[in-house]
């Protein structure tokens, strides 16, 4: 079973297991480069770091750091979500400054680079061709379409794109 971490965020047991499964395909490599879009507090970046601990690697994670308030009570009710979801939402809320500080605290002493910026197609990446791209950004149609376009331009055999929370385009 995958290793859990106690960082705030939205990962469930299946998410840790999925990250571990993706990373297991890279454990025989000499070096692995991960590019994550959508850091929140660093929970998934650290899950990748832990899953790749037996192979040299580096993780670059990017988030616009606007803070996070989550969906409104009205949307939660419309979706039929319960008070447990509201409690999780409330526990994960932050200001932009709190989010920024928490990310840096969480990734301290790890081979993870954080970029405080908005991802967009055409961004001048520090990672030209990552082995793993993990997209957990805004989940908008446009941004998801753009990450697929970006991936189609850099994808070669042996590289992986993981899109979190994709319900439908």
Residue ranges, per PLM feature:
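S-adenosylmethionine/decaboxylated-SAM
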Residues: 2-9, 16-169
């Amino acid at each position: 079973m995958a290793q859990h971490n106690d960082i705030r965020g939205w990962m469930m047991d299946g998410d840790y297991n999925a990250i571990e499964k993706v990373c297991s395909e890279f454990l025989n490599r000499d070096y692995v480069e991960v590019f994550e879009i959508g850091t929140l507090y660093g929970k998934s970046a650290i899950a990748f770091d832990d899953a790749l601990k037996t192979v040299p690697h580096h993780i670059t994670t990017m988030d616009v750091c606007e803070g996070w308030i989550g969906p409104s009570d009205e949307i939660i009710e419309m979706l039929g979500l319960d008070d447990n979801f509201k409690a999780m939402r409330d526990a994960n809320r932050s200001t932009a400054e709190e989010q920024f500080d928490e990310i840096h605290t969480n990734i301290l002493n790890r081979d993870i680079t954080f970029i405080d910026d908005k991802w967009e197609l055409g961004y001048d990446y520090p990672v030209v061709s990552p082995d793993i791209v993990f997209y957990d950004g805004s989940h908008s149609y446009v941004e998801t379409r753009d990450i697929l376009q970006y991936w189609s331009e850099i994808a070669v055999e042996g590289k992986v794109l993981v899109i979190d929370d994709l319900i439908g385009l």
